[in-house]
Amino acid sequence: MKTLEHTFSSTALNNISQLIQSGNMGFGPNVEVFENAFKHYSNKEYNIATNSASAAAFMIFAYLKEKYGKCNVYTPSLTFSSPVWAAKHFGHNIIFVDVNDELLFDCEDYLKKRTDSNQNIVMPILYGGVSNIPGWKLRGDEIVVIDAAHCPHPTIKGDFIFTSFHPTKPICSPDGGMLSTNIKEAAEYFKNYKNFGRQLTNESYDIVQEGFKFYMNNLSATIALESFRMYDVNLLNRIKTFEFIQDKFQGRFLKHDPNSSYYFATLIIDEPKQINLKYKLLTHYPLLHKTLYYKDCSLPNTEQLHPKIVNLPLYERMY
């Protein structure tokens, strides 16, 4: 499903074209420029650009395994597969949590399922672009990893945030992500990890830890920067479209908050098939706990709401 239509000014296209013509598309200065600019949205001291949000999640769970050993990771089943797989890959225990009526992390269900056998990690999903989760209530000793793939400007408090700049996201690039944190030690680990575990020396480099090719290149950073500069204008257009379509469909629209990205409009309706067929829409996402790879469990509200979901793109010419 195409969720967004991106517009670039002639100036932006010229800047991107000049970068391509220069040949400086691999390593380059715009990665750091983008990281520094993004601090305004993440409200975190350290922002590490990656080649995908999946890579960012992978590094987070690698770091947490190294720091705390096996952890318990609590997350909704209504999410993209790669962050959950990354946690499982590093040996963490996956415990699926139900969602509330807004399709967001249900804290009450988490508190019922929580055990203290390992360090507890919660990974809420900012579904549809919301920036916060009303009624957010934890014990206070958890590590909070925010899946902000839909929302580049989260206001919910967390220890680690990963954001997506996939071509279909509110800030776009050919592909890319950002990992944001205030923890200096972790930031240094991530900077090395995304660059094959390397640290530069006077004449070459040394391998100081595990790592992989997870860095963002200069071309992706340049495109993401231009998209970032258009974010506020494009957001206003998405808000207008959201307001416009609320009168066109019957059912319950999920709420957006003042810092939401309005990634898409989610409609809960008893018979979604006709709308999904008409607009060629797919539900974000298949439920992970119902897939072959993950352990089945009971998530009553998730299972009751999932067949009723319609995710509507917020570009006006669709309607």
Language-model features, listed with the residues they occupy:
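Conserved PLP-binding active-site segment in aminotransferase class I/II-type PLP enzymes
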Residues: M1-K67, R229, Y319
